[in-house]
Amino acid sequence: MVSQTSTATIGFTLEDFAALLDKYDYHFSPGDIVAGTVFSMESRGALIDIGAKTAAYIPIQEMSINRVDDPEEVLQPNETREFFILTDENEDGQLTLSIRRIEYMRAWERVRQLQAEDATVRSNVFATNRGGALVRIEGLRGFIPGSHISAREAKEDLVGEDLPLKFLEVDEERNRLVLSHRRALVERKMNGLEVAQVVVGSVRGIKPYGAFIDIGGVSGLLHISEISHDHIDTPHSVFNVNDEIKVMIIDLDAERGRISLSTKQLEPEPGAMLKDRDLVNEMADEMAEIFRQKRLAEAQGIPYEPPTSVDDTDDEEDESLAVSAVDE
């Protein structure tokens, strides 16, 4: 005699089993992050057990944010890790997975954090184009505009160079990661600079609005309005490229990576930059000290009193002696 239990067991068909699986099957949707175990490696991908009825598949191009030539560079049999569900089930009921998407999301999260901390990062230039240079930060492709590359060598020679960089723009939605080499250099250089400091620089470029002065590997702007007290039609009438001049720092803007310079404040008399540049260079330190004293007086809210020169003191003494002689 066959028991009822045995009859029930015999009557449990494959269709019943499939229906039971459907009843308790988890629903997977694109965008979900799930745990999965590698159970089969293929030449261009791998099969992953994530608890679905059919093994999910991850193609080699979705295994990393970086280039992968062999799946075993990233995955090993029986390894368990997180996967991103990339697509719905295909006609065979198979899901497509991705590790690259997870790395991509976390990379953007990391660069946003680095930008918020105003961190300086380093990266090798892997290519250049007409607009600038290309680097990778946390696996993401970043762009350095030509105007933010501060280097004395040709742009195309930067390939392979390890550069310090600051973040200019981090926009995941638009897939824009823009960085500045110049700002990183200026920030580092600024640690040894201060307003009212006199430095020697070389004219590296001349524009209608001013001259760019190289001061130890970084550029500062000598605006046309800060060249002289006298009117100047164009900086070209005052400077030539590669001229060596003394300039005074009048502003340091670390956030924008800008150094503002002046020769106007170093003029012992108006127009000296146009008439006698050697005199400006000779008296640069003295005029810079006067500039510092003026700024200090302004900060304290008191009027500035220029120091009495030695010649003026001698004249006063001569006048005093002359008066004494007359009295006698």
Curated annotation (Swiss-Prot):
Asked if the record carries the keyword RNA-binding, the reply is yes
Pfam families per record: S1 (PF00575)
Q: Name one GO cellular component term.
A: ribosome
- Keywords of the record: Repeat, Ribonucleoprotein, Ribosomal protein, RNA-binding
The S1 motif domain, residue ranges: 31-100, 118-182, 196-264
Regions of biased composition (Acidic residues) lie at: 311-328
- Region annotated Disordered sits at 298-328
Q: Which SMART domains match?
A: S1 (SM00316)
Recorded hits in CDD domains, A to Z, give: S1_RPS1_repeat_ec1_hs1, S1_RPS1_repeat_ec2_hs2, S1_RPS1_repeat_ec3
Gene Ontology MF annotations: mRNA binding; structural constituent of ribosome
* UniProt cross-references to InterPro entries, sorted A to Z: NA-bd_OB-fold (IPR012340), Ribos_protein_bS1-like (IPR050437), Ribosomal_protein_S1-like (IPR035104), S1_domain (IPR003029)
Look up the record and give one Gene Ontology term from the biological process aspect.
translation
Q: Which family does it belong to?
A: Belongs to the bacterial ribosomal protein bS1 family.
Give a short account of what the protein does. Binds mRNA.
Extract the NCBIfam families matched here.
PRK07400.1
Q: Please identify the protein, giving its name as recorded.
A: Small ribosomal subunit protein bS1A
Species for this entry: Synechocystis sp. (strain ATCC 27184 / PCC 6803 / Kazusa)
Classification lineage:
Bacteria, Bacillati, Cyanobacteriota, Cyanophyceae, Synechococcales
